[in-house]
């Protein structure tokens, strides 16, 4: 009598997927990314997290939320570099995805197709309310999209917009509370009008 046969062992295969966490500044995107990555580590999964090398606001190497929670990361200049670090990885985290080049879309697709869980966090819109970097395409190819919201600093409603409070028209301006504030649609439109910006 055979009590245990290899025929009955089901091989656990990795299931790749793409998860996107998007929203305005101060909405908890990085916080949620860190939470998911730490849960994966607790489950003994092999994880690697990446951030754009240009983001040195809180740390040159770690991913750090506005609430000062952090996780070790690898800063990179090009999305293609991610593939160099992921041969033995189960879960890949990517923070501030809006700052990466459009090659990130194919990189994430390739990782997921190879059985890797990819968790992406980033701004879905820039300070003008326009889609930001590769985020729209990443949302389109994602298996799951979580839109998180901040609280409007003017009225307390849910905030979806990142209003820039300093005079600078560059799309990329790394900043914190001194440069940006989260606003709901109504307060954002009002603030843009007061700034003399096109709405």
Curated annotation (Swiss-Prot):
Binding site for Zn(2+): 152, 155, 184, 187
Catalytic activity reported: thymidine + ATP = dTMP + ADP + H(+)
Pfam families the record matches: TK
Record EC number: 2.7.1.21
Coiled coil stretches, renumbered: none
Name listed for the protein in its UniProt record: Thymidine kinase
Chain sites annotated for binding ATP: 23-30, 95-98
HAMAP family (UniProt xref): Thymidine_kinase (MF_00124)
Example GO BP: thymidine metabolic process
Assembly, per entry: Homotetramer.
